[in-house]
Curated annotation (Swiss-Prot):
The lineage of its organism: Bacteria, Pseudomonadati, Pseudomonadota, Alphaproteobacteria, Hyphomicrobiales. A motif ('KMSKS' region) lies at residues 253-257. This is Glutamate--tRNA ligase. HAMAP family: Glu_tRNA_synth_type1. Catalyzes the attachment of glutamate to tRNA(Glu) in a two-step reaction: glutamate is first activated by ATP to form Glu-AMP and then transferred to the acceptor end of tRNA(Glu). The gene is gltX.
Length: 484
């Protein structure tokens, strides 16, 4: 594997809470750059205009900084190959699309969403994987010009060889062969003029002189499209490395429905960023038992991409807890520990906001732990009996919790007003009084029916912590339902 003049990148999409999987891939790239004296670049891939938000972009940058990762170039600090936000690079992509059209490597497609869905349904019914059937491939230049002049919506798709296979060497998987007839005629430029991930990432990687592309294994099947684009443009392709996905202990894909996946969740609960990076870094090195506690510098020294395993990286929270505890006890001095605790308590003004809400609700300072302590707890230790005093039957409580969890994910800006508005809307949709809906939420979020105002508490705790507490509450109530 050539490593001269190494430039690597992490290119997250700002469409939600920053995922630990992003930290996992970012850390690999960061360590790879450090190992080879290269440069680590941050690029924001916000081609999904409907889901990307400045708020989530800020959270991505803050989360990666909290992890202790530093980039040489990025949207916040600039660099010689900017802009580093794909939406700001939009004018750059169209000329490359026109080049592909002129060379006969791409074509305009006028198929409507309805027609494409009918096509996919027919393919699925026939037991075939859905992919574009090439209807617009045979359009003449005159037909294309006429339909565009008539104002028909068009996208640009890439042409794919009809036979043979794409053979390449991956830095992790070794020699890979993917038949061309399994590769879709990918949309390159969407109807709004924005490029898809496949088009933008190839162009950006080339223009930013990226030498090694390390990303999750879910992109392995897309490599033929990317290699083909490099060939169409006459560019040298980077070295591809596809890392095994992080998985739960049961080998299922890591997802927020089963375990907390957002970096902010671990930050909010008081995990040490060095411990989280230590935990993730262990997936990239080989060590003996007893050598697990490692700083970033030590991880970099032991890092060897040649020894990567294709086996899934198991995200074992118990091991993370163990490692985090060792960091607190063995790596932090008494002064550092006290400083970390104070910084954590004041993070996002959580403690200050809790004190402000508590002041008018207590008669003695000693009442604070019972009233506001839930804001700083990692685990409320909810039991089925905690919900027994709620007037609603357990079946109704469980229905409320299971309805609220996914609906809260629809909130774009997480604050008191949006939380209240969504919960009121949920109550209306369920045909229930707001009090009936929020009563179990008080217990789920704070562990008690007497607590600080619910909407304020949820806003202070943050989306990721609330998500996890609602999930654990639903499990407790499900046990109550099952015991009847």
């Amino acid at each position: 594997m050539t490593t001269s003049g190494v430039r690597v990148r992490i290119a997250p999409s700002p469409t939600g809470e920053p995922h630990v999987g992003t930290a996992y891939i970012a850390l690999f790239n960061y360590l790879f750059a450090k190992k080879h004296g290269g440069e680590f670049i941050l690029r924001i891939e916000d081609t999904d205009a409907t889901r990307s938000t400045p708020e989530f972009e800020t959270k991505v940058l803050d989360a990666l900084k909290w992890c202790g990762l530093e980039w040489k170039e990025g949207p916040d600090i600039g660099g010689p190959y900017g802009p580093y936000r794909q939406s700001d690079r939009k004018p750059m992509y169209q000329p490359y699309a026109e080049e592909l059209l002129d060379k006969g490597h791409a074509f305009r497609c006028f198929c409507t969403p309805a027609r494409l869905e009918q096509m996919r349904e027919a393919q699925r019914a026939a037991g075939k994987p859905p992919k574009y059937d090439g209807l617009c491939l045979s359009l003449t230049a005159e037909e294309v010009t006429s339909r565009m002049a008539a104002g028909e919506t068009t996208v640009i798709r890439m042409k794919i060889p009809a036979e043979g296979s794409c053979d390449f060497t991956d830095g992790v998987y070794g020699d890979v062969s993917i038949p061309w007839d399994s590769v879709d005629m990918q949309v390159l430029i969407k109807a709004d003029g924005m490029p898809t991930y496949h088009m933008a990432n190839v162009i950006d990687d080339h223009l930013m002189k990226i030498t090694h592309v390390a990303r999750g294994e879910e992109w392995l099947a897309s490599v033929p499209k990317h290699i083909l684009l490099y060939r169409y443009f006459g560019w040298d392709q980077p070295v591809f490395m596809h890392l095994s996905l992080m998985r739960n202990a049961d080998k299922s894909k890591l997802s927020k429905r089963k375990n907390p996946t957002s970096i902010s969740y671990y930050s909010a609960l008081g995990y040490i960023p060095e411990a989280l990076m230590n935990f993730l870094g262990l997936f990239f090195i080989q060590i003996a038992e007893g050598e697990e506690l490692l700083t970033m510098e030590e991880l970099s020294a032991k890092f060897d991409p040649e020894n990567l395993s294709k086996a899934g990286a198991i995200f074992d929270i118990q091991k993370l807890d163990w490692l985090n505890g060792r960091w607190i006890r063995e790596k932090l001095s008494e002064e550092e520990f006290q400083a970390r605790v104070l910084a954590w308590a004041m993070e996002n003004d959580r403690l200050k906001a809790g004190l402000r809400l508590s002041q008018t609700r207590i008669s003695k300072l000693g009442e604070l732990p019972d009233l506001a302590g839930f804001l700083l707890k990692s685990d409320l230790g909810l039991q089925p009996s905690d919900f027994a005093k709620i007037k609603s039957p357990p079946e109704e409580i469980l229905e409320i919790l299971n309805t609220v969890q996914p609906d809260l994910e629809k909130i774009l800006e997480w604050n008191v007003e949006t939380i209240e508005a969504e919960l009121r809307a949920i109550a209306d949709r369920m045909g229930k009084k707001l009090k009936v809906v929020v009563s179990p939420l008080f217990v789920a979020v704070s562990g008690s029916s007497r607590s600080l105002p619910l909407f304020d508490s949820m806003a202070i705790l943050g989306r990721s912590v609330v998500r996890q507490r609602l999930k654990l509450a639903a499990q407790a109530v499900a046990a109550l339902v099952g015991s009847k």
